[in-house]
């Protein structure tokens, strides 16, 4: 007999630094999931992304067991790391906060390719460049 899905939760947690506090506790507590077990498994799986926000999708079953899928870090956080800034521009059309090269955008697109809705690497690179522009980051090259 297959397990019946009780619910699904989506949230972002810093890689390798999950705790039972929000957003993990508030999202999974209502399903009765063992938070300590989730935190330990998540931290083990994402320790190489220490501190980088990682999107996670948790599927909870009727016996309170769970499976989770981790996605690649958001493009915005990868761009901020590449550009060496803490946050994007509040007024991206007027204030430019940093510069990245097209090669850096292509590298980010390579890492995010499986999560992006793009047919090839060129389309994915253009999507990353659009994200950079909307953050007030200039794309050179």
UniProtKB/Swiss-Prot annotation:
Any one GO BP annotation for this protein: translation
Segments for region (Disordered):
1-23
Q: Name one GO molecular function term.
A: structural constituent of ribosome
Instruction: Kindly state which keywords UniProt assigns to this record, in alphabetical order.
Output: Methylation, Ribonucleoprotein, Ribosomal protein, RNA-binding, rRNA-binding
Q: Quote the cellular component terms of the Gene Ontology held in the record.
A: cytosolic large ribosomal subunit
PTM comment: the record says: One or more lysine residues are methylated.
SMART domains attached to this UniProt entry:
RL11
Recorded family membership: Belongs to the universal ribosomal protein uL11 family.
Q: What does this protein do?
A: Forms part of the ribosomal stalk which helps the ribosome interact with GTP-bound translation factors.
Q: Give the matching PANTHER family.
A: 60S RIBOSOMAL PROTEIN L12, LARGE RIBOSOMAL SUBUNIT PROTEIN UL11M
Q: How does it assemble?
A: Part of the ribosomal stalk of the 50S ribosomal subunit. Interacts with L10 and the large rRNA to form the base of the stalk. L10 forms an elongated spine to which L12 dimers bind in a sequential fashion forming a multimeric L10(L12)X complex.
Protein name, UniProt field: Large ribosomal subunit protein uL11
* UniProt source species: Rhodopirellula baltica (strain DSM 10527 / NCIMB 13988 / SH1)
Tell me the name of the encoding gene: rplK
């Amino acid at each position: 007999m297959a397990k019946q899905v009780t619910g699904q939760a989506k949230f972002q947690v810093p890689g390798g630094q999950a705790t039972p506090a929000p957003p993990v506790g508030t999202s999974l507590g209502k399903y009765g999931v063992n938070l300590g077990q989730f935190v330990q498994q998540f931290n083990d799986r994402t320790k190489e992304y220490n501190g980088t926000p990682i999107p996670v999708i948790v599927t909870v079953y009727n016996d309170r067991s769970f499976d989770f899928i981790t996605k690649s870090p958001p493009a915005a956080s990868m761009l901020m790391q590449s550009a060496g800034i803490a946050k994007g521009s509040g007024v991206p059309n007027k204030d430019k906060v940093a510069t990245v090269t097209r090669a850096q955008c292509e590298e980010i697109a390579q890492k995010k390719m499986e999560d992006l809705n793009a047919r090839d690497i060129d389309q994915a690179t253009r999507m990353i460049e659009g994200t950079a522009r909307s953050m007030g980051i200039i794309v050179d090259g």
